From Swiss-Prot:
GO terms for molecular function: GTP binding; GTPase activity; translation elongation factor activity. It comes from Methanosarcina acetivorans (strain ATCC 35395 / DSM 2834 / JCM 12185 / C2A). Catalyzes the GTP-dependent ribosomal translocation step during translation elongation. During this step, the ribosome changes from the pre-translocational (PRE) to the post-translocational (POST) state as the newly formed A-site-bound peptidyl-tRNA and P-site-bound deacylated tRNA move to the P and E sites, respectively. Catalyzes the coordinated movement of the two tRNA molecules, the mRNA and conformational changes in the ribosome. It holds the Pfam family EFG_C. This is Elongation factor 2. SMART domains: EFG_C (SM00838), EFG_IV (SM00889). Belongs to the TRAFAC class translation factor GTPase superfamily. Classic translation factor GTPase family. EF-G/EF-2 subfamily. Residues 19-228 form the tr-type G domain. GTP binds at residues 28-35, 94-98, 148-151.
Length: 730
């Protein structure tokens, strides 16, 4: 207990000195060794025993994670490392590498200032490496590089000392190429990774050794020595001379920014308020005496303490009993406990100052992305944007009817813990639908519901999530209210792809100041009058009011937008969500008496005009795609390409590396079910493959009617396809 008590004391002392804090994430492609690295860093810092490190998977504290051997959630831990005779506090988050859990990476990146990017020396940079690096740079998180599994390069691939250095150089060049393409300004500002400068370390997380140029100078161990030790299989001596935690954590402390340095540049990226206000200045300087500004990046459930909100404290200090506001809620909450993480355990402390990662209970209203503050009316932080969208759905039912109320509560909880999961109730069938990033994501959530929440459930076969869209512009369509006293004239047309991208990237939203939003849209090619008339943005669809001087329209616009949102949630063709549509209101006739233009009149009138307009504009479907990357011996390449093309896949690129072929393809998600088994048999089990979200594309007309028919049948809709007149005669 003595050692642990001492550790807690060191952590709580250092919390108060932002110069000596580093908030970092560890990111990588699946199986490149993040969690093993995290565990050995903890062992080096005296948090877990050295013998267990790497096997204990301390950070994978969830049974599901240990059974599957992958990290599913992000884990937090605080530890102390001594560098140049000074103690430093390192708050570390280990993130998942599997594409289905990319949402966790996005959220973790909001909490940290620096990232250790782990790349397997044998496999090199992989698709998920690119994705996590892009997420880090988008959040202005500075990267350093750790090239892992160097021993495999020497012992499995039998490369000589010179070839080893060439291959490691290639990995560094590729990572720099990615940084340069994704963020040229940061690259110019010195964010590239450079072995000579010390921002790259090489080693083996499993065997607990690592080397970097500063480390070589310190220990006198050269690349040649590393090669000889690995060849001789003497990893133990190497680990004694060049301990992993020393090389990596020294690099982190020396090159990654402390909260004060980081927040100077990061605050303006993640917060769009006025930097010259008191709260703006407090956040830019990580001022512990300022108003509280805390961003929630994760919510978990503790069986004893209830909901625990973890996040980054940008200004002010968190103390027990303080009253706070949560964005999106008018009610105040009272903070019950504040604490920090030590692996999966939460340690209570009295006070946590700005610049730290904190865990708080008592914030009933908070969800992931919430801004928690003591300042009423504070501009909230930018919402956290996820790189992928949910593309696969399953229907969930309780096995025993008595569990239904519990299931509803559990689904609400699960959706709160994992914002990349979408839970909806199908009003017509009464089923609960769970949409996620992929098959594995939904499997894990289903297991978790049964295991942690003790509710037995049955799930349907996975169903693909489609989007409805349109192909051409229509004339204005008249929508009449049921009492015939109100009329709206609305036309629909496809929204430009540049504008759709800007909405998805968060560059255009209703939260932006109006003039800034207008200018952005004009720059993207929208006409000035249209940009001025935008009154609603929902998902990737917009509603524009081009009318002039219509009486009572102001007070009914909210209801018109309700009608618009209803259609965008469930389009007329298949009741699937709508994407990339622009609806324009050109005229309206409204009854002068407010009683005759209530919700029951206005919403249906707007809804019908938009539904009919979409059907006249050639309503069509978009289907989700996945990019698939397959590594396979060249001799078996034919089997792999045949398997991909047989699934309506398009081969985008083929390259060779040694005797391996690397195939990059784009395949519809609908065709990807059962792919794992089939690709194994097509390549004698020798293919390595991974996927990432590949966007949406129009369903080929040859199969459109079949798919529409299947969706309508599944949802219990009429077999015959709807016509515009069905909506206008209502």
């Amino acid at each position: 207990m003595g050692r642990r008590k001492k550790m807690v004391e060191r952590v709580t002392t250092l919390m108060n000195d932002p110069q000596r804090i580093r908030n970092i994430g560890i990111v990588a492609h699946i199986d490149h060794g993040k969690t093993t690295l995290s565990d050995n860093l903890l062992a080096g810092a005296g948090m877990i025993s050295k013998e267990l490190a790497g096997k204990q998977l301390f950070m994978d504290s969830d049974e599901e994670e240990q059974a599957r051997g992958i990290t599913i959630d992000s884990s937090n831990v605080s530890m102390v490392h001594t560098f140049d005779n000074e103690d430093y506090l390192i708050n570390l988050i280990d993130t998942p590498g599997h594409v289905d859990f990319g949402g966790d990476v996005t959220r973790a990146m909001r909490a940290v200032d620096g990232a250790v990017v782990v790349v397997d020396a044998v496999e090199g940079t992989m698709p998920q490496t690119e994705t996590v690096l892009r997420q880090a740079l988008r959040e202005h998180v500075r990267p350093v590089l750790f090239v892992n599994k160097v021993d495999r390069l020497i012992n499995e691939l039998q490369v000589d000392s010179q070839e080893m250095q060439i291959r490691l150089g290639k990995v560094i060049d590729h990572v720099n190429k990615l940084i340069k393409n994704m963020n040229p300004e940061k690259f110019k500002a010195g964010w590239k990774v450079d072995a000579a400068a010390g921002t790259v370390a090489f080693g083996s997380a499993l065997y607990n050794w690592a080397i970097s140029v500063p480390m070589m100078k310190k220990t006198g161990v050269s690349f040649k020595d590393v090669y000889d030790y690995c060849k001789a299989g003497d990893m133990k001596s190497l680990a004694e001379k060049c301990p992993l935690h020393e090389a990596v954590l020294d690099m982190v402390i020396h090159f990654l920014p402390n909260p004060i340095e980081a927040q100077k540049g990061r605050v303006k990226v993640i917060w769009h308020g006025d930097e010259n206000t008191e709260i703006g200045k407090a956040m830019t300087h990580a001022n512990a005496e300022g108003d509280l500004a805390f961003m929630v990046t994760d919510i978990s459930v503790d069986p004893h303490a209830g909901e625990v909100a973890t996040g980054r404290l940008f200004s002010g200090s968190l103390t027990r009993g303080m009253e706070v506001f949560t964005s999106g809620s008018a009610r105040k909450s009272r903070v019950q406990q504040v604490g920090i993480f030590m692996g999966p355990e939460r340690l209570e402390v009295d006070k946590i100052p700005a610049g730290n990662i904190a865990a708080v209970t008592g914030l009933k209203e908070a969800i992931v992305g919430s801004t928690v503050t003591t300042l009423d009316g504070m501009t909230p932080f930018e919402s956290i944007r996820h790189v992928s969208e949910p593309v696969v759905t399953v229907a969930v039912e309780a096995k025993h009817t008595k569990d239904l109320p519990k299931l509803i509560e559990v689904l609400r909880q699960v959706a709160k813990e994992d914002p990349t999961l979408q839970i909806t109730l199908d009003e017509e069938t009464g089923e609960h639908l769970m949409a996620g990033m992929g098959e594995l994501h939904l499997e894990v959530i289903a297991h978790r519901i049964e295991r942690d929440k003790n509710v037995e459930i049955t799930t349907s076969k996975p169903i693909v999530v489609y989007r409805e869209t349109i192909k051409k512009k229509t004339e204005p369509i008249e929508g009449k209210s049921p009492n015939r006293h109100n009329r709206f004239y609305i036309y629909a047309e496809p929204l430009d792809t540049e504008i759709v991208s800007a909405i998805k990237e968060g560059e255009v939203s209703m939260n932006l100041p109006e003039l800034e939003r207008r200018q952005k849209l004009i720059d993207l090619g929208m006409e000035k009058e249209e940009a001025k008339g935008i009154v609603g943005i929902f998902n990737s669809n917009i509603f524009i009011d081009m009318t002039k001087g219509i009486q009572y329209l102001n007070e009914t616009m909210e209801l018109v937008l309700d009608g618009f949102e209803e259609v965008m949630r469930a389009g007329p063709l298949t009741r699937e969500p709508v994407a990339n549509v622009k609806c324009v209101l050109v005229d309206a006739k409204l009854h002068e008496d407010a009683i005759h233009r209530g919700p029951a009149q206005i919403i249906p009138a707007a809804r019908q005009a938009i539904q009919a307009g979409m059907l006249m504009a050639e309503d069509s479907l978009l289907e989700p795609y996945q990019k698939v990357f397959v590594q396979v011996p060249q001799l078996l390449m034919g089997g792999a390409t045949k398997e991909l093309q047989g699934r309506r896949g398009i081969i985008l690129n083929m390259t060779t590396e040694g005797d391996l072929a690397i195939i990059e393809a784009r395949v519809p998600v609908a065709e990807m079910f059962g792919f794992a088994g089939e690709i194994r048999s097509a390549t004698e089990g020798r293919a390595m493959w991974s996927t990432e979200f590949g966007g949406f594309d129009v369903v080929p007309s040859s199969i459109l009617n079949d798919i529409v028919g299947q969706i309508r049948e599944r949802k219990g809709l009429k077999k015959e396809l709807p016509k515009a007149s069905d909506f206008l005669s209502m």
